[in-house]
């Protein structure tokens, strides 16, 4: 009788604890990879590097981003935690409780967008795709085919559009 809960724990362990080597996570069923909190952290350094590369490219082109807007709290966390060495602009998100932080004093002139082009495009004159990010090791997680883009020409200030950017999906 006691073996059943233990067996259940062992089956679910790879979803919540880093017991599978990162290079082998791709061997799990894709549904398990997408549900795994552990799999969602795979690729954080690479995502931050990819966003920083687009930030630098836009700056070289005379369009330095004035803020970064993400579609989900995971991207916001990765950029906040690992992005300080890149001197990135303020990172904003309308996802879950990130929305409550508000835009602060961040400018909306040129917004580097991570996983939220569709969400921001109604509020800007121009939005375009710059790159598509995929996590390393063929892992299928929430960051698979993640779009990185840029939006310019805001139709209103952050404080005006902010109430419309909140989402809990």
Name these PLM-found stretches:
Residues 2-64, 74-77, 81-87, 94-96, ...:
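Membrane-proximal, lumen/periplasm-facing interface regions of secretory-pathway glyco-
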Residues 64-68, 109-111:
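Short active-site oxyanion
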Residues 84-124:
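Extended hydrophobic/aromatic segments used for targeting, binding, or gating
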């Amino acid at each position: 009788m006691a073996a059943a809960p233990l067996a259940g724990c062992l089956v679910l362990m790879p979803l919540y604890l880093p017991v599978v080597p990162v290079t082998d996570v791709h061997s799990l069923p894709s549904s398990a990879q997408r549900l795994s909190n552990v799999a969602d952290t795979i690729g954080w350094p690479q995502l931050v590097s990819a966003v920083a590369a687009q930030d630098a490219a836009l700056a070289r082109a005379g369009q330095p981003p004035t803020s970064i807007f993400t579609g989900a709290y995971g991207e916001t966390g990765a950029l906040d935690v690992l992005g300080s060495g890149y001197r990135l602009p303020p990172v904003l998100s309308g996802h879950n409780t990130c929305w409550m932080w508000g835009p602060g004093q961040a400018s909306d002139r040129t917004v580097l967008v991570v996983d939220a082009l569709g969400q921001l495009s109604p509020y800007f004159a121009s939005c375009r795709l710059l790159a598509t990010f995929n996590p390393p090791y063929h892992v299928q997680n929430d960051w698979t085919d993640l779009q990185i883009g840029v939006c310019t020409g805001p139709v209103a200030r952050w404080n005006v559009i902010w109430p419309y950017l909140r989402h809990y999906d």
